[in-house]
Amino acid sequence: MNTFIIFIILIPIVGFALLAVNILLAVYKPYNEKLGAFECGLTSFNQTRLAFNAAFILVAILFLPFDLEISTLLPYVMSIYLVSNYGFTIVLLFLLILIIGFVYEINTNALKINKHNKPNTDSLIYKL
């Protein structure tokens, strides 16, 4: 039998076996400190959940393609003397697509973060 097929069959079996052992042998004793938010071992005096500006998440999501660009271009840089003009054309096309995407992000103000965006603290969640 092929080694790959053995791994495909064996890995889920081992994973489920370890999960079953954990479920059967684990001790479940919840208490307030375990169920609460971690505050460096100190009891918090107010609500720990604050509103988070979604623009920061958007910047992180938009950062991913440009971060992956570096790992995609690294093999080309290492083999620049071995690839022909065809490889160079493919890399230029790849960079052109990324540049078009970046210009689109700038034109749609996707990277603009509103400085005056404050969370609504009038909600009952934020009161003691």
Swiss-Prot record:
The keyword Iron does not apply. The chain crosses the membrane at residues 4-24, 50-70, 86-106. One of its GO terms (cellular component) is respiratory chain complex I. It is a multi-pass membrane protein. It is found in: Mitochondrion membrane. GO terms for molecular function: NADH dehydrogenase (ubiquinone) activity. This is NADH-ubiquinone oxidoreductase chain 3. The gene is ND3. It comes from the Eukaryota. Keywords: Electron transport, Membrane, Mitochondrion, NAD, Respiratory chain, Translocase, Transmembrane, Transmembrane helix, Transport, Ubiquinone. It holds the Pfam family Oxidored_q4. It catalyses: a ubiquinone + NADH + 5 H(+)(in) = a ubiquinol + NAD(+) + 4 H(+)(out). It is an enzyme of class 7 (translocase). Complex I is composed of 37 different subunits. Its EC number is 7.1.1.2. Belongs to the complex I subunit 3 family. Its main location: mitochondrion. Core subunit of the mitochondrial membrane respiratory chain NADH dehydrogenase (Complex I) that is believed to belong to the minimal assembly required for catalysis. Complex I functions in the transfer of electrons from NADH to the respiratory chain. The immediate electron acceptor for the enzyme is believed to be ubiquinone.
